[in-house]
Amino acid sequence: RPFLYFWEGAEPNSGLAPERYHVDGVYPQNDANVVTSGGSGFGIMAILAGIDRGYVTREEGLARMERIVSFLEKADRFHGAYPHWWYGDTGKVKPFGQKDNGGDLVETAFLIQGLLAVHQYYINGNEKEKALAARIDQIWKDVDWNWYRNGDQNVLYWHWSPTYGWEMDFPIHGYNECMIMYILAAASPTHGVPAAVYHDGWAQNGAIVSPHKVEGIELHLRYQGTEAGPLFWAQYSFLGLDPVGLKDEYCPSYFHEMRNLTLVNRAYCIRNPKHYKGFGPDCWGLTASYSVDGYAAHSPNEQDDKGVISP
């Protein structure tokens, strides 16, 4: 099903993932052609899995990837970073908010993560596949991670706008879904940031460490604004980054930390303090999705639990 959503449900011109899909074809906000950068990074990886499993031929898969990369080469970018949304028919930025009409470094990281997976899949292939890998390599090298330090500060900022500059004013600290952004920024062969950006910005010189228990399960890190975040905080950064054996001076095992964060989510749903029908050991998972109140980052706490189990 994830493969079919991204394969059959793609916006026709760009080949990218739609921001939302309405089965009835009715779009009250007239946004049927709006595509998302980060979500497309996830979709690209799903398509790769589909190619590898024979859901489509290798030639069909390559053609889709070529369409996607051709769109990305021409679509609006801001110091190499992509916006959260575009109009899929034109490649022009669709503002995510009043002042959010420029680069979104977090969503860009999710997209680059997917593109790098494609790069590795094709780098030793035939001539057409190698050519596509080279084009992806250039997109990766074009992202100016250093620009998003807002004047060489030792932290990365989420947004920059050609109209409003840094007015969104959102420096990113951990832990949340953004770890992959800091990893890619440090790894960039052309615009790599110094290690101090990770240590001072992401880890806040050790303030990210905050051992505690939630639902009786041990967590080692501080989670921004909550004791334990939504499920996607344990997922997005590790689609392309293997947590097994991964550690640093702030976390002795990212695999065990993310496993425990996931188990907190399950334990909360089993306890089900708001008594939702259906919640239990085989029906759980609070993460970002639609709800009766629109989009919400559903989390394992009573304030952010709206009774939505996201498929």
Where are these regions (language model features)?
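Ser/Thr/Asn(+Pro)-rich, low-complexity disordered segments
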Residues: R1-P311
